[in-house]
């Protein structure tokens, strides 16, 4: 199953929350019977066809024919079609600068009043666009490579993302989440890069934010893990990407018997880096203050396989196209 879980999915596990209804589905998962998997590291392509179990001889023969047809298509590709694109695109914000600052100040008041420790508020930018986001995705693969490069086309609606952040992984019963908080740009050379990394790892504010998210990750993983299995396996490491560096930790746990990948997503969603702490109260404040529903943004993108394994990233650094409108979202983490 491949697809997304929207930000509003938290209302499933926490019915006390009344999240704004979005123009996109709360979740959308797709089952594919034909898959082309490409291993970029080993430069190896695998063609997979899932066959039905009734009439196995005939189904097997059909699956082999399908594989050969796919291989023939790959080895004799058609010229890449030129995709329609708008050259002059201007985004408009759903907030004026004054309105956004007012939202930030209200968030600060909640922190001073003791409701929350930190909160992540965001605003949406949108534009009219008739082209395909596949063009933008092609460019981003080169200019901003990330651990999770995503392009989805779901019945005409498009999603692209260059997310660096894992929400939750599940592999052979072992859960992992990777809290990320604190950032600096990459340096122009090694000396500047090392200096920025040293500055980041010594920044008390960045470390306080990061520690809060590590605690939140331990709590979220702990809800679905076996007793005494939760541990921090990596702590406050500098992780470098093409244009930015972050402080990253890793939290691990063993999934409780009787639970599965969907329980893992439910427990971790939304990530603390997209909501705040305590998470439930932060989500209530976000819903109160933000004008527009987040939709896919702040949720998760990824897959669940037939062995019950899971890999999802946080739906961030992304764009969504629905109809002729494209939406992007920018956030601000408020911590005092």
Regions found by a protein language model. Give the residues of each.
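Extended alpha-helical targeting/anchoring segments
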Residues: 1-334
